[in-house]
């Protein structure tokens, strides 16, 4: 499979999601990284977004709550190339009714080579990378052949 690139701008488009048990940890991480985060476009699911909007005192594009389709809305934006980063503090110890949505979101992020941070340590490494403040040519698999596999004769 061939590759192509998608240019991430200096201003990244970052999705922030946290399960209920992880919201305090994400909030603490956001407070610590406020200055850096405010240089970028932020997106979030509903409850997380409302909390973070109040904390950061900035506009965040807010989708539905995760269990009501918000995870899938963010996944769709990733597939469209409209989100560059996924910061998703999810709870590995609590079964959730929307576990399939979580798996689908993580899968779509991997398919489109979107950086994912699932805990504070990985989020710290991503946000502190020197690549955060510069353009970055993200390598993407070229799925054109895959998309046409059943339609060509």
Which residues does each predicted region cover?
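Mid-chain, well-packed structural core segment of small domains
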Residues: 71-111
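Short, acidic/small-residue loops that bind anionic groups at enzyme active sites
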Residues: 105-126
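Short, glycine-/small-residue-rich phosphate/pyrophosphate-handling segment
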Residues: 121-153
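Short internal beta-strands
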Residues: 39-48
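Short hydrophobic/aromatic-enriched beta-strand-loop microsegments
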Residues: 41, 58-69, 137-140
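Histidine-anchored nucleotide/phosphate-binding helix
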Residues: 24-35
């Amino acid at each position: 499979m061939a590759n192509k690139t998608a240019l991430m701008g200096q201003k990244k488009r970052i999705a922030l999601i946290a399960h209920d048990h992880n919201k305090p940890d994400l909030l603490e991480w956001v407070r610590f990284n406020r200055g850096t985060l405010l240089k970028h476009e932020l997106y979030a699911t509903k409850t997380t977004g409302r909390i973070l909007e109040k904390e950061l005192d900035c506009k965040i594009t807010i989708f539905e709550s995760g269990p009501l389709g918000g995870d899938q809305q963010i996944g769709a934006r990733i597939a469209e190339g409209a989100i560059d980063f996924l910061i998703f503090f999810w709870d590995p110890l609590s079964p959730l009714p929307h576990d399939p949505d979580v798996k689908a979101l993580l899968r779509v992020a991997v398919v489109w080579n979107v950086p994912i941070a699932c805990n504070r340590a990985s989020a710290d490494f991503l946000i502190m990378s020197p690549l955060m403040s510069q353009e970055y040519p993200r390598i993407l698999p070229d799925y054109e052949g895959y998309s046409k596999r059943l339609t060509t004769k």
